[in-house]
Regions:
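Conserved, well-structured interaction surfaces
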Residues: 20-100, 116-127, 133-134, 138-140, ...
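Acidic, glycine-rich segments characteristic of secretory precursors and extracytoplasmic regions
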Residues: 1-20, 573-585
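Long, intrinsically disordered, low-complexity segments
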Residues: 49, 154-167, 263, 267, ...
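Elongated scaffold/linker segments in the mid-to-C-terminal portions of large proteins
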Residues: 40, 201-418, 423-428, 463, ...
Length: 585
């Protein structure tokens, strides 16, 4: 897996809309960015995925699954993990190449390579792999005999003495996450949602489900996406607003040896002497493998930055509403008023390191400064579940994940029997207890009120509602109306944005709402998971689903995708889905 790590990130991000090239950008990255990559491009290699697949094939073919220690099967978890990893690797091939050779036998002789294996597209790959994986649903990943929270150290980088560690269990991918991802790509939204729910209720580390993050903001000291400082009128002075959310700073997810929120990752070695290294940190301007002599700053940042946040991402971050409690001298309850600030979303800013250089400012993206290649985070999976719910027509459930998160409060009612969460339908509330049983009698204790956070609150402040027993200081009664981040309002704003951008007649049908919320989820994925290797696949998947829905004419998905990426000046017409794939080699 370490051999494919750099390619995974660059294939996923360079063709997306969240990074831009610089004077120092490698030509291979430039070619990916403008869709001119040929089979000579060093980041276009199906081989690195097939190498993983063949290793898995070999293990699966030769593993004796009847090995027991007493009544405990001591190998089945690793056997399942090999099948999940193989499916994940095929999923990446299906995303990047239109059709790929498919085989499940181990290739041990050169003569086997020339066999006429069937070439399958992504839907056929899912059809081949998913039925076998279904029998392993709800199975945990291997722990290799150590505590799931345990960190093993693997040496230190040359420029610092602090040891780098990794979590062995997080080097595997839960089978339900792979199944959910495959079904979502294939447009089987019900199966995708069921498997994501199974992951959260049967597999996920329970402490992760109750971890809260917020990019906690301090006025007039937070770097804006454009490199300047927030003006005085962007937010009231500190004594005029209240910190309404608690929890760990969101950027700690990407800190040294963190495991919270991380489901699966590829930890890279701290030095060449310790194993396989990665070039990803250096591409973003951080020389993780510098010697102490090469460290010219407090940390080994370099001036030759190859990738920066795109103007689109900076604009999205800066234009996102930030919500805060306003307090007044004569106000009885300082938590009655939630206001909108022009300060923007805090997540991008919390992973940007900035230093002055003369009259300009230099910015570095810090997500990779500890050489961890993230594959899945719980936050990512919640957003994929929101995407599936939305396409199932459960638009309110999708918004719940953005605004409030999943918690017992969803089932709460006032004395007169009316629900606390007024924007949820009775049908959705019932589905969350039965069909997608996050809040069934068996599972509801996994999601306590006090630790429920909507994903949007990670960076946008007081987007959530208040509820009895909740984390908010003003949570005496449940009130969905305090924060301006409301379902109807946000959908209306997004509909107007789409109408203006694409010149389409946006109506008030269910499909119009689904499309608008899908774009809201797309924005949230940008703010939450930027630079993690997902973006091209998110855009491509959503464009495909828009086309399949038939909304706004025959090829709205293609037009939507092409417009988002027009700033990259692609050399091909991205309205044509045939141009969405890399040349296979």
């Amino acid at each position: 897996m370490q051999m494919l790590a750099d390619q995974y990130v660059m294939q996923g991000e360079m063709r997306g809309d969240l990074v831009k090239t610089t004077f120092y950008t490698d030509k291979n990255l430039r070619q990916l960015a403008n869709f001119s990559a040929t089979t000579e491009n060093k980041y276009d290699s199906a081989y690195v995925y097939y190498r993983v697949i063949n290793n898995c094939n070999y293990y699966i073919a030769h593993c004796d699954t009847n090995q027991y220690n007493g009544s405990t099967n001591v190998v089945i978890d690793k056997y399942i993990a090999a099948k999940a990893t193989r499916a994940w690797a095929y999923l990446q091939l299906g995303r990047n190449y239109e059709r790929v050779p498919f085989f499940t036998e181990p290739l041990t002789q050169i003569s086997q390579i020339d066999r006429d294996y069937p070439e399958l597209g992504l839907p056929e790959l899912v059809a081949q792999l998913a039925p076998d994986l279904e029998q392993y649903s709800a199975q945990p990943v291997p722990t290799l005999g150590i505590n799931i929270n345990a960190i093993r150290t693997n040496g230190s980088p040359n420029w610092e003495s602090a040891a780098k560690g990794f979590s062995p269990s997080r080097c595997f991918i839960p089978v339900d996450v792979v199944l959910g991802d495959m079904y979502l790509e294939a447009g089987n939204y019900d199966a995708a949602a069921r498997h994501f729910v199974t992951y959260f209720t049967k597999v996920a580390w329970k402490e992760d489900l109750t971890s809260s993050y917020t990019a906690l903001m301090r006025p007039k000291s937070t770097v804006s996406g454009a490199g300047g400082r927030m003006m005085d009128d962007d937010l009231p002075s500190y004594n005029q607003y209240t910190d309404e959310v608690t929890g760990m700073d969101w950027s700690t997810i990407f800190s040294r040896n963190n495991i919270l929120d991380i489901v699966s990752y590829i930890p890279m070695a701290p030095s060449a002497q310790n194993g396989t290294t990665t070039n990803v940190p250096l591409i973003f301007g951080f020389n993780y493998y510098a010697t102490s002599e090469e460290k010219t700053r407090t940390q080994p940042y370099v001036d030759e930055i190859q990738l920066l946040p795109s103007d689109y991402l900076n604009t999205l971050s800066d234009s996102t509403e930030y919500y805060y409690y306003a307090s007044h001298t004569n106000q009885t309850n300082m938590y009655d008023s939630v206001r909108i600030s022009t300060a923007g979303d805090m997540r991008l800013r919390s992973v940007i390191h900035q230093e002055a250089s003369g009259d300009t400012a230099i910015q570095w993206i810090d997500k990779y400064k500890y050489a961890q290649i993230l594959l899945y985070r719980n936050s990512t999976i919640w957003l994929r579940l929101a995407e599936a719910f939305n396409r199932l027509g459960m638009t309110d459930a999708a918004f719940l994940i953005l605004k409030d998160g999943i918690g017992e409060f969803v089932l709460g009612t006032y004395a007169d029997g009316s629900p606390w969460v007024s924007y949820l339908s009775d049908e959705t509330r019932q589905a969350l207890q039965t069909t997608y049983p996050l809040l069934s009698t068996e599972n509801i204790e996994l999601f306590p009120n006090s630790r429920a956070f909507g994903i949007h609150t990670h960076g946008a402040g007081k987007a959530a509602s208040d509820y009895p027993g909740g984390k908010q200081p003003g949570g005496i009664t449940y009130n969905t109306g305090k924060s301006p981040y409301q379902l109807d309002r946000m959908v209306g704003l997004k509909m107007q944005e789409l109408a203006d951008a694409y010149g389409v007649a946006v109506g008030t049908t269910k499909q119009d709402t689904i499309n608008a919320i899908e774009d809201m989820i797309c924005d949230e994925l940008a703010l939450e998971t930027a630079f993690e290797g997902n973006r091209w696949y998110d855009l491509k998947r959503m464009a495909t689903h828009k086309n399949e829905s038939g909304i706004y004419g025959g090829n709205f998905g293609g037009r939507w995708l092409a417009r988002k990426l027009a700033f990259k000046q692609p050399v091909v017409n991205l309205e044509d889905k045939n141009n969405w794939y890399l040349p296979f080699k």
